Amino acid sequence: MKQRFGKVAVLFGGSSAERDVSLMSGAAVLAALQGAGVDAHAFDPAERDLHILKEEGYDRVFIALHGRGGEDGTVQGALELMGIPYTGSGVMASALAMDKWRTKMVWLSCGLPTPRYAILDADSDFDAIARDLGLPIFVKPVHEGSSMGATKVTEAGQLRAAWELAARYDSLVIAEEFISGQELTAPFLDDRALPLVRIVAPDGNYDYQHKYFTDDTRYDCPCGLPQAEEEALQALILKSARVLGCRGWGRADLILTPEGRPYLLEMNTSPGMTGHSLVPMSARVAGMSFEALCLAILAGARLG
């Protein structure tokens, strides 16, 4: 295994708002790779400069960073310049998928379904936006993940406060219409869609706390959909990743209405790999252990 992969750096931690989640993801990945006999080492970009990777002779990188500075194309660009292969999507797709607004623009231009939205700023007519999108409305930073800075607005008078909260995290804030239905997530590995996971939060609010620090959210995998319907959604997910230029692995979130209509929400190019994370759960149902999943992701490390 050491000869196959060489010296591997697992990048985790970083300085984004999702640092704590990344620390959990990276520790799990590192333990799995080392357990499989890979010469893997921890590397926190918040504590060490990236150029050290080249100086210390690393052969490839497993990116377990989340949020800005980790899955937005910046680290990927640095690794491209150093000529060190890395896991996941390349520079362009990473930057694009991190931007919820432009991701939606691409999806819509390709005829893919996604909820209606508006970009908010200090001069927005919040009452008009509430009337146009209807209530409830989800408000979130354009460039954050893990529901950081996100709010579910149930009254028009709450919209400005929700924008102010999201604006603490990002200069760009998006308001998205609420779509009622099943919340699903769909991981993919290379050109293969993994089993869908249905997410059932006890209060219907799958926020940061529910994602990583509580056990009261129910995850159904298999998701319970008829095979033909699940396969159609998996095909949609693969197309949604392809039009963004994603590669390697990732996870898309979507809503399925009671009428059976899907709406794409977000694309994650460096999903969580914690004990609560959904990609390992889906892979397990597909017959892959966590160790096998990490090795498969690492095997896909590349440049370009």
Swiss-Prot record:
Protein name: D-alanine--D-alanine ligase
Record keywords: ATP-binding, Cell shape, Cell wall biogenesis/degradation, Cytoplasm, Ligase, Magnesium, Manganese, Metal-binding, Nucleotide-binding, Peptidoglycan synthesis
EC class (word): ligase
Gene: ddl
Residues noted as binding ATP in the record, renumbered to the chain: 130-185
Catalytic reactions of this protein: 2 D-alanine + ATP = D-alanyl-D-alanine + ADP + phosphate + H(+)
Cofactor comment: Binds 2 magnesium or manganese ions per subunit.
Pathway(s) served: Cell wall biogenesis; peptidoglycan biosynthesis
Binding site for Mg(2+) 1: 253, 266
Cofactor(s) demanded: Mg(2+); Mn(2+)
GO cellular component term of the entry, any: cytosol
Kinase listed as a keyword: no
Its job: Cell wall formation.
Residues bound to Mg(2+) 2: 266, 268
An example molecular function term from Gene Ontology annotations: D-alanine-D-alanine ligase activity
GO annotation (BP), single: cell wall organization
Location(s), subcellular: Cytoplasm
Record-linked Pfam families: Dala_Dala_lig_C, Dala_Dala_lig_N
Domain ATP-grasp residue range list: 104-299
EC id: 6.3.2.4
Family from the record: Belongs to the D-alanine--D-alanine ligase family.
